Amino acid sequence: YHAGDLNWWLWAGEDAAFNRQMTHDFLAQMALIEGRRFDVAFLPLDPRQEADYAEGFDHFMRHTDTAQAWPMHFWEDFSVFQRLADDPRSAPYRAKVAKAEWYRR
């Protein structure tokens, strides 16, 4: 699975209506794949979203049966990998997330 730009795009600087629409659109698409099995998924994990950096990633991992997840959209900010590893929300799927060192040349 490759999410492309499909993500729960919440932005602190946007108005509430925009973020509500982003929430609606993301959850509508996720409902189409709820519970499906994926061997590998490439998912946005975007530090530019600040506190909401992992909303879409977390939702995907909790609502699908994904064997391995590869973060993308992290703009070479590899610190987001450790941030996710330290995030209590990731505990159920932490071992399935690719490690930052796998990306480095």
Model-based region annotation:
Residues 1-62:
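Active-site-proximal loop/helix segments of hydrolase catalytic cores
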Residues 54-105:
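Binuclear metal-ion centers of metallo-dependent hydrolases, dominated by the metallo-beta-lactamase
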